[in-house]
Amino acid sequence: MKSFVLFAACMAIVALSSLAHAYPQKLPVPIPPPTNPPVAAFHNSVATNSKGGQDVSVKLAATNLGNKHVQPIAEVFAEGNTKGGNVIRGATVGVQGHGLGASVTKSGNGIAESFRKQAEANLRLGDSASLIGKVSQTDTKIKGIDFKPQLSSSSLALQGDRLGASISRDVNRGVSDTLTKSISANVFRNDNHNLDASVFRSDVRQNNGFNFQKTGGMLDYSHANGHGLNAGLTRFSGIGNQANVGGYSTLFRSNDGLTSLKANAGGSQWLSGPFANQRDYSFGLGLSHNAWRG
């Protein structure tokens, strides 16, 4: 019954998008914006937390500060929960251009500090295909503890117009090593509707000797007006199967397209295994605003 209610809620979010109408402004003399103007983007989101309270995050980013060849990246962010606890604060700086990019992020919550380094490369293979590679490393320092957790990730993806494939590896030093392979395909696409399908397999090796596999698939539908639905099924070897469903919608978008309000809802349920019938639900709102300058 609850799964039906969740699905109905997702459908309701999509239906709400029909209430948002955009009325184009008619200016006697259209004035184009400056070439490649800087933009400050503000993002704010609120989401339910299964452990209680609401997770709140804010981010302020400045992009388009460079030229058509090189773009600096700069942002600050904060995350916390309405029930209290330590607030995570951080900042990211980087640069991207000519298909290459690099950034560093430092964050902390008063108990632990993390420093993340990331680099990526995008190689165009003709008009409709790209080969994308990413590597990152996150070092964490916890106050009063000598052990310093380290998470390393690397991925290689081939993305075409209708098909895609990727392989990635995530190493959590002293904890686990995960290798994931995935394939995606565009099933249907026109001016308004898009339907994608994907399958994946993850081999998880943990240092405590408990190893398992995750295999699954997902269908993802999206509409040009900014709403969509997705559903997936994941099998954990030796544990059980878990179903997921979600939906999102753009509730409001300003006439100039610079401000938008989005909502999302989702949930999961274990279908078998020791966690059978255990459910998790979530709901969130996201507000974003881009302030043009120049």
From Swiss-Prot:
GO biological process, one term: innate immune response
One Pfam family, short name: Attacin_C
Location of the protein in the cell: Secreted
GO cellular component: extracellular region
Expression tissues: Synthesized by the fat body and is eventually secreted into the hemolymph.
Signal peptide residues on this chain, from the entry's feature table: 1-22
Prodomain residues: 23-24
Main location: secreted
Pyrrolidone carboxylic acid modification, residue list: Q25
Keywords, comma-separated and alphabetical: Amidation, Antibiotic, Antimicrobial, Immunity, Innate immunity, Pyrrolidone carboxylic acid, Repeat, Secreted, Signal
Residue positions where Arginine amide is found in the record: R293
Note: Sarcotoxin II consists of at least four structurally related proteins named sarcotoxin IIa, II-1, II-2, and II-3.
Function: Sarcotoxin II is an antibacterial protein which plays a role in the inflammatory response of this insect. The main effect of sarcotoxin II on E.coli may be the inhibition of cell wall synthesis, including septum formation.
Similarity comment: Belongs to the attacin/sarcotoxin-2 family.
This protein's name: Sarcotoxin II-3
